[in-house]
Amino acid sequence: MNTEATHDQNEALTTGARLRNAREQLGLSQQAVAERLCLKVSTVRDIEEDKAPADLASTFLRGYIRSYARLVHIPEEELLPGLEKQAPLRAAKVAPMQSFSLGKRRKKRDGWLMTFTWLVLFVVIGLSGAWWWQDHKAQQEEITTMADQSSAELSSNSEQGQSVPLNTSTTTDPATTSTPPASVDTTATNTQTPAVTAPAPAVDPQQNAVVSPSQANVDTAATPVPTAATTPDGAAPLPTDQAGVTTPAADPNALVMNFTADCWLEVTDATGKKLFSGMQRKDGNLNLTGQAPYKLKIGAPAAVQIQYQGKPVDLSRFIRTNQVARLTLNAEQSPAQ
């Protein structure tokens, strides 16, 4: 009778109350139980008050209760009904398995992104190449146009400057064509004269001399005079080394150009006169003289070396950009575009 009453009384008590009564019968404090079970005092207090901490999993709570029961000598089978109420097992949340189709979809999206990136890159490269080609083509067309203009100007000048026949049929004075056989005074030959003018040789009255415009501008002082045809036999020749003829001084504004390859160029002086316009071949030299400043247009700057006032002209900026050089050489030799 007493055993059944005790059993019914134990069933009426909760798990926490039974553990607390057993602890008190053994004379243990909550601190002692907590130290033996390596738990916090607050956890032991919650177990005795039948509280389930929210931050503690039910599996751990059931294990703590079993350890507490073994410590106070209470069979675990008697506590199982109370454990189901105090610490019920919670169903674990199972994360849904990721399907492989999601990875394939992401790979497909990444593939489209890479394709679009490469497409944009190819478009940028194509536009850059097209821009460079158009610029290069425009430069070539400009050079061709300047060469055509130069050819047209040269052809028009050649049409206007056709050969002009000079009528030399007029009879010349015998006194000018022949010299009497008189002795030449040596004292007269030692006298320096500013210029020596020789009579023109006798020509056939029926023969016409043809002189082009470019030959008409040649300085007659630089042309050698045939004195043998006008000096009779026995006459002493004039000493040309004592004639007092001096060579002209070099022009300080002279423009010297040496060509390492074929190159088209145009040179204009301050008066607007074109000193040269046309094509120069490889290994050619060009010496120009005019009124400074000079305006130059050079189709291939890398193919020409320019010296102005004895100093080289820097064309590196035009060579780097590979474009037609347009520059002005002033008296201070500072090329400006």
From Swiss-Prot:
Primary site of residence: membrane
Cytoplasmic side: 1-111
Entries under Pfam families matching the protein: HTH_25 (PF13413), RodZ_C (PF13464)
CDD domains according to UniProt: HTH_XRE
DNA-binding region residue numbers: 30-49
Segments on the Periplasmic side according to the record's topology features: 133-337
Disordered as annotated region, ranges: 145-218
Cellular compartments annotated: Cell inner membrane
Membrane topology designation: Single-pass type II membrane protein
Residues in coiled coil: none
Ranges of Polar residues composition bias in the record: 145-167, 208-218
Biased composition (Low complexity): 168-207
Molecular function via GO: DNA binding
InterPro entries referenced in this protein's UniProt entry, alphabetically: Bact_Cytoskel_RodZ (IPR050400), Cro/C1-type_HTH (IPR001387), Lambda_DNA-bd_dom_sf (IPR010982), RodZ (IPR023690), RodZ-like_C (IPR025194)
Transmembrane residue ranges: 112-132
Keyword terms, alphabetized: Cell inner membrane, Cell membrane, Cell shape, DNA-binding, Membrane, Signal-anchor, Transmembrane, Transmembrane helix
Gene Ontology cellular-component annotations: plasma membrane
Gene3D superfamilies for this protein: lambda repressor-like DNA-binding domains
Residue span, HTH cro/C1-type domain: 19-71
Matches recorded under PANTHER family: CYTOSKELETON PROTEIN RODZ, PTHR34475
Family: Belongs to the RodZ family.
Role, per record: Cytoskeletal protein that is involved in cell-shape control through regulation of the length of the long axis.
Name of the molecule in the record: Cytoskeleton protein RodZ
